[in-house]
């Protein structure tokens, strides 16, 4: 599970969101990496290159907008995400075809 980096003093002021912002204050303890203060993002928290960019299920996320693109997928490594431009009628046909081919659909 990824580490959640939160904004400095986000809990102290209601108007501050949790979204990460780099601390830039001159005397900021967080900026100076003092012990007992929240961690800041660093290159060491990066994911391993084998899983970087993959869907949490472990499949490569591929956007498909027609049957030909769906049939070209590798069911072992890739999962389909049906484009929003595809209508309901075509989407049901694509879902049936994906079930036949054993392809995982990320947005059924």
Swiss-Prot record:
SMART domains registered for this protein in UniProt: Ribosomal_L32e
Any one of the GO BP annotations: translation
Family statement: Belongs to the eukaryotic ribosomal protein eL32 family.
Top-level taxon in the UniProt lineage: Archaea
GO molecular-function terms, A-Z: structural constituent of ribosome
Cellular component terms per the entry's GO annotation: cytosolic large ribosomal subunit
Segments for region (Disordered): 21-44
This protein's name: Large ribosomal subunit protein eL32
UniProt feature, compositional bias: Basic residues: 21-30
Keywords: Ribonucleoprotein, Ribosomal protein
Lineage start: Archaea, Methanobacteriati, Methanobacteriota, Methanomada group, Methanobacteria
């Amino acid at each position: 599970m990824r580490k959640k980096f939160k904004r400095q003093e986000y809990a102290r002021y209601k108007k501050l969101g949790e979204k990460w912002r780099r601390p830039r204050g001159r005397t900021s303890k967080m900026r100076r990496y003092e012990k007992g203060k929240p961690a800041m993002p660093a290159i060491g928290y990066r994911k391993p290159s084998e899983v970087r960019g993959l869907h949490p299920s472990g499949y490569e996320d591929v956007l498909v907008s027609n049957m030909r693109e769906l049939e070209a997928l590798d069911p072992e490594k890739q999962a389909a995400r049906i484009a929003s431009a595809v209508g309901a009628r075509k989407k049901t046909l694509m879902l049936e075809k994906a079930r036949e081919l054993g392809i995982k659909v990320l947005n059924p």
